[in-house]
A protein has these predicted regions:
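N-terminal periplasmic accessory domains that precede
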Residues: 12-15, 40-63, 79
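Extracellular loop and loop/strand-boundary signature of outer-membrane beta-barrel proteins
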Residues: 66-68, 120-125, 177-184, 236-243
Length: 280
């Protein structure tokens, strides 16, 4: 078992890289209890994946491409690769996915105020570029019919760039003011996580003992630059820059001990330790 706390963008990328034939079942739990996480406060999407049954190597390659039919100023492509390998009690799996979004556009606005002899014209151009890269490598080893161990590594890179250029002209009572603005914003987001787990079946009724350890590192760097030049009635420049950073180290280990009292009831106990550090 592995708990993922994803943003909306990360969840979409994870689901897009799943193959339908690898999914055993999907459960949506609106209100999750402590049996899923000790500090659970929201809902849970529980995805159960199939194990590779046959030995050997199997894989899949896919490619998706989208574009705007109207002006072709927006496009998106998504290549992905899945590879799985099984030999005796050892199973290896890997996934690589990439998504690239590009969008350009603009707008023009012209206003006339007859009661105040005022004219305002504005022209804005925008360019948006974003990519999302995911990599996963994992293994499961069945020690025997009752015991198994596993390890998994995940990495995500998600850079985002947005550029906006604008020109505005305001004329009132014969006086004019022209402004030229430039905005550049970038966000570099990265995530790395490592998970190790051990599972033991205690009896035929379904009693189990599980231990899962997880380390996650998140890094987010933002850069926002904005410059405006005014000329005409007033002549001056305005420049601002904003560069926040945030780094998170998260380590968690949990052990679950489920005792089956009968075929229809069980006693679930567990212990969890979590340590979070943040630097921003």
């Amino acid at each position: 078992d592995r708990v993922l706390k994803e943003t909306g963008e990360e969840l979409v990328a994870y689901l897009e890289n799943l193959k339908a034939e690898d999914i055993l079942k999907i459960e949506v739990i609106p209100y999750a209890g402590a049996e899923y996480d000790a500090n659970a406060t929201g809902g849970v999407i529980k995805i159960t994946l199939k194990k590779q049954r046959e030995e050997g190597l199997e894989g899949a390659v896919s490619m998706r491409y989208y574009t705007s039919i109207v002006d072709q100023k927006a496009w998106n492509y998504q290549p992905s690769l899945n590879l799985n390998y099984k030999y005796n009690a050892l199973s290896l799996y890997s996934k690589v996915g990439y998504r690239r979004n590009n969008w350009t556009g603009g707008n023009m606005e012209s206003d006339r105020f007859l009661d105040r002899d005022r004219i305002m014209d504005a022209n804005t151009g925008m360019a948006h570029r974003q990519s999302h890269t995911t990599f996963q490598l994992g293994s499961v080893y069945d020690i025997n019919d009752k015991q198994s161990v596993g390890a998994e590594f995940n990495m995500t890179e998600n850079p985002y760039h947005n550029n906006t250029d604008g020109t505005a002209l305001a004329i009132e009572s014969g006086n004019s003011l022209t402004s030229q603005s430039l905005s550049r914003s970038t966000t570099d987001y990265s995530l790395m996580s490592f998970t190790a787990n051990y599972s033991l079946k205690l009896d035929t009724l379904g009693s189990t003992f599980k231990t899962v350890a997880n380390y996650t590192y998140r890094n987010k760097e933002d850069s926002v630059y904005y410059h405006t030049n005014y000329s005409g009635m007033m002549n001056y420049d305005s420049t601002s820059r904003y560069m926040p950073t945030a780094r998170y180290d998260m380590f968690a280990i949990r052990s679950d001990f489920d005792i089956a009292l009968s075929k229809s009831s069980k006693l679930a106990t567990g212990l969890k330790y979590q340590r979070n550090t943040m630097d921003n």
